[in-house]
Amino acid sequence: MITEIRFETTESGVLRPNQERVHDVRITRDGQIVHVILSTKEAAGRGMRHIRDEYQIGPGTAAAFLDSLTADFGIDEWPMDFGSPVLEGRTYEITIRHDDGTVRRSRGTVDLPPGGEALRNAVIGLAAFKRKPWIF
């Protein structure tokens, strides 16, 4: 049984001031959703700015979503790599944790996994996100 999924999406390319670079979204079976955004600082600033928003949804809703990953999206059959060579653009890594301690990862760049658009919409529909998360 899936206990948690994490979507980490990273923007590559030239660094610019005030630019979002990473979105990290975690959804747990107990209904916790954490959305972390890393972005560059102002033009004179060094380092990254870290924004963390947390949301709580019903455990039943969270469990139904996590169960749908296998039943509706076939996530357990995804290959480990959907990548295509790119120099700029987004890359993503999905980490899936199971109750038996196993961890499964898939990553990609340009090519979305099967049902990727529908999965993105399902995640975005789980909570009233303050900032729209990058999912893929």
Regions found by a protein language model. Give the residues of each.
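Short, flexible N-terminal segments of the mature chain
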Residues: 19-40
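Short, flexible, solvent-exposed loop/turn segments with mixed acidic/basic and small polar residues
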Residues: 41-45
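Short, well-ordered, aromatic-rich surface patches in folded extracellular/luminal domains
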Residues: 1-23, 47-61, 68-136
